[in-house]
Amino acid sequence: MELAIRTAMTTLGGGMLERLLAADPGYRGPGTDCGAGHQAEFVSYRDKTTGTVLGPVTVSRAWYHCGQCGHGLAPRDAELGTAGQTMSPGLRKMAARAAEAVPFARGAGLVADLAGITLTGKRLGRHAEADGRAAAAVIEAGAAAIAARTLVPLPPAGLPDKLYIAIDGTGVPMRAAETAGRPGKGEDGKARTREVKLACAFTQTRVDEDGYPIRDPDSSSYLATFAPAAGFGTLMAAEGRRRGAGHVRQLTILGDGAHWIWNLASQHFPEATQIVDLYHAREHLHDLGKLLAFMLGDQHDHWLAGRSGELDDGDIPALLSAARQFSLAGIKAGELDTALGYFETNAPRMRYKHFRSCGLFVGSGTVEAGCKAVIGQRLKCSGMHWSVPGAAGILTLRCQQASGRWEEIWQQPPSQSGAA
């Protein structure tokens, strides 16, 4: 009974909305600006059916044509946020929320079950990807303005003591056309994924009774992009400024040791403390132990335990000295140099005992969790293969949702482009 009443109320509401919109068909006189500085002339009234949260609604709008541009437009469409769209802003918002959360077909099913609106999975996905890309364009434009210093974000209210930016990357499965000609890690040497770079910014104001840092609840914000490192750096810098970098007492960059991460950190936040994720460093140490296992024999575990203690203390010179006591030749010698180079290069970022004494995080678990929760749970499901634009759109939606900024997407001014 209640669902039947809901259906009836939706139908009734759709009729009311249709009548309300009919009161202003958007006639703006015999001529109106086409958006490119020309005069578009009134032609006639034309009907357009748009999907809304109250079902399909048909509106008769004044239609103008610009002879110089060669295209038509309905001013009323731009005012309603439906220019070039087949869905209302309200329905697009609903569709995008479903599409960022679950696969498109399931999302369409959720919209049908929860709102009584019928959409195909393809239509839902197409609109969600487009709205995500539009949101990404706004974010990128804002980041460029911050980089150019034409926009200066105000520091957040209640400035935290410590701000962290943790950085990582993960592969997203792609359609063959998106990876053609790219080298990969598979046996055939072909790429099947494209790397998406992810940054997670979060704050900290206290430590627990044992002195371990505690992330402030609900303080994480995310950004993700397929752009090269330079583009990612611009976005990361803007997010850092928005979160208070330059005003907080302590800014820390966390990463896995990749050179591009530290290059960006030094470029955009030279004042920041740089820390290599301790757990990545431990993985490298275990790889070093495997490399030397044939020489260590039954002393392997004892030797590795000693080096682990040195790593946890940040005593990288002692670790390097212990490893260099072994004389290797040929390929093994080169592998040892590479393994030790990781610790040599990152030694200033591995002062873990000192960092912990300062109450700082030494692990990048937040961004690794983000790679799984924000990216993997939606874009890396079985059988999925994305286009870069499609994946980028959904990623933007997911980052905004995970960052608590969902409403910001829908606060942008409506498009002024010609109507479809």
Predicted feature residues:
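A broadly conserved sequence feature marking short terminus-proximal activation segments
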Residues: 1-41
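Catalytic center-proximal scaffold of phosphoryl-transfer enzymes
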Residues: 1-17, 61-420
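A short, compositionally biased
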Residues: 28, 42-45, 59-60
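The −1 position to Zn-ligating cysteines in a subset of zinc-ribbon hairpins
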Residues: 30-33, 49, 65
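Short Cys/His-rich metal-coordination motifs, predominantly Zn2+-binding knuckles/fingers
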Residues: 34-38, 53-55, 67-71
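Short, non-ligating residues that shape and space the ligands of small metal-coordination modules
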Residues: 40-42, 75-76
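Short linker/helix segments within small regulatory modules
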Residues: 50-61
